[in-house]
Structures are given as C-alpha cells and as structure tokens.
C-alpha cells in the first residue's frame, strides 16, 4: 500500500509539472507576448533542472530524501505562484520563474526513483521491482496525457483562442490553469508526503529501539 501511496504522490507532483508543460506555448505567446523567447525559456528550465540534480542528491543525504522532496514541492509552488502575477512583457520575471521551477524539476527527476528503490529494499519487494519502476514510468506519461485532457478543454470552455486576441477572462483562466492549479497540486503532494513521513517515523524509531534491545547484552547465566 505504501508503494501505491508513493506512486500517487509522484503522480500528483508530475501532473502539477505537466500542466504548465502543456500550456507553456500559450502562456509565453498569448499572455507574455514573447513568442520568440519560447525556446530560450524552455532551455533555461531544463538546464536548471539538470544542474540541480546533484544538489538534490546532496540535500537528500543531509535532510533525507522525503524531506528534500517536500522542500522541492514548496519551491515549485513559489515559482508557479510567481507566474500567476505576470503579464505582457514580463520576460525577465518569467526567466526567474523558469529557473525556480526548473530547480524543483531536478528533484522530481532525482528523488522519486531513489525513494522507491529504498522502499523496495526496505520491504524486501525486489521480486516486484520491475513492476514498480514500470508503474513509475507509466505514471509520468499518464500525467502528461491527463494534463492535456484537463487544461485544454478548460481553456476552450473559457473562450481562449490560441494566437489571437483574447478577453481578460480567457487570459485569467490561462494564468489560473498555468500557475494556480499546479500550485494546489504541488501543495497536495507535499502534504501527503509530509503525512507519510510523520507516519513512517514511529515505525522507524520503534525499529531502532527494537534493534537496540536485541543487541543488548544479557546479564542472565
């Protein structure tokens, strides 16, 4: 059951990242008005994610993998909320958003597979490790498909027209879908993960106490 909870948390986190990925072209072109910079923004985002991967590994050693993942979700929320307040011509501010959200992406690429590997090893589920990793890959791909199924009809219902003049309501819907909905999903993911950490601690502590008692020397003959 814990494996499926971790997969659900990962799914929420990936869905939060996938919605902006689906809408980024619309956001940059139709809201920011800087279509010519789309490629540079994407490059900045992915380079930030790749460069952050060693940093997240180091942080996971210092703080713990689950704790580091919680922190990365909060960092992603900071980036997404910042994007909500942007408007036409705010390309420098959006570049900062790309860096911040890219840094958070590095954690999503690094930590979940490692956390799942630790879980498999701790619970002696090595016989099912292939299935678990296959599910991890499936969840990532399904999240992208689900993001398209949610975001695009939502924009269409609000009257948003790509590459055209749009009403304030349509652009506001775009901002909400691009920034606030992912923020809510990331916060939910962080909350579930934090709850998982709290539930895991008593068992870990008990295990350490039990292990210590088993190795305590006996005073009986």
Q: For each of these PLM feature ranges, what is it?
A:
Residues 1-221:
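Membrane-embedded alpha-helical bundles of multi-pass transporters/translocases
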